[in-house]
Amino acid sequence: MASVFGKPRAGGGQQSAPLEVNLAILGRRGAGKSALTVKFLTRRFISEYDPNLEDTYSSEETVDHQPVHLRVMDTADLDTPRNCERYLNWAHAFLVVYSVDSRQSFEGSSSYLELLALHAKETQRSFPALLLGNKLDMAQYRQVTQAEGAALAGRFGCLFFEVSACLDFEHVQHVFHEAVREARRELEKNSLARPLFISEERAVHHQAPLTARHGLASCTFNTLSTTSLKEMPAVAQAKLVTVKSSRAQSKRKAPTLTLLKGFKIF
Ligand SMILES: Nc1nc2c(ncn2[C@@H]2O[C@H](COP(=O)(O)OP(=O)(O)OP(=O)(O)O)[C@@H](O)[C@H]2O)c(=O)[nH]1
């Protein structure tokens, strides 16, 4: 069966079902994951938040004239990847964030890229990842050069961008849309035309031996018996609440976004 996306619409009259893309934002504490997520969803920069809050948001996007139902998981690991299966088994693509003014966060992003590489090896699938050097507005306090970011991305074969959650929305939006494009490419490659979430599907648990060898925090990988299907994270980990976006202020269209509780938006 042909892929449901990436094809021109037949007949012009029929609307294709929106492509469903799950995106997980990974990175060390303070790298700016929440700020980037909220910037993308609301065009606003937040400066206060609850660092322990992990939530999944959804947004109806249009990428390359195609409707996309995008879910964004703003993860809240502590200092290292933990209980990674909640996003490894869920996301179609990953944004790995570090802060250009923090060498520590850059090293943290390298751990996340390694984790993704190991997961890809374990599952024999590839997972698009984009490396983001955030807080570009703080470039005068740089601890990580652009060349270092590009080199790390090159090592893992992923796209690289420097961004700022404080600066222009369009650049942040571009990066998220690039992640959607990457996910779409991968999904098309795998000819995934089946529904993405089948709750009856049983996960076969096995311990990933690679994590210990690579000094990563303990992670258990779930390999689905049908490897092309992914499970939604447990309800406790993914709270979807629809609210109106500030973008809806344009009266023409009111895209729905999901919850921003826990964030103070100015
Ligand atoms: N100057 C500047 N500050 C930023 C930027 N992005 C985030 N911050 C600030 O950096 C701090 C951490 O940002 P968060 O978005 O909460 O970082 P996080 O990665 O989600 O951190 P955890 O929630 O602890 O995992 C906050 O004080 C933000 O206001 C940015 O692009 N520029």
Curated annotation (Swiss-Prot):
EC code: 3.6.5.2
The reaction(s) this protein catalyses: GTP + H2O = GDP + phosphate + H(+)
Transmembrane feature ranges: none
SMART domains, per database record: RAB, RAS, RHO
Binding residues annotated for GTP, in chain numbering: 27-34, 74-78, 134-137
GO molecular function, one term: GDP binding
Family annotation (SUPFAM superfamilies): P-loop containing nucleoside triphosphate hydrolases
Domain of life: Eukaryota
EC primary class: hydrolase
GO cellular component: a single term: plasma membrane
Keywords, ordered alphabetically: GTP-binding, Hydrolase, Nucleotide-binding
Family: Belongs to the small GTPase superfamily. Ras family.
Name used for this protein in its record: Ras-like protein family member 12
Species whose genome carries this gene: Bos taurus
Gene name per UniProt: RASL12
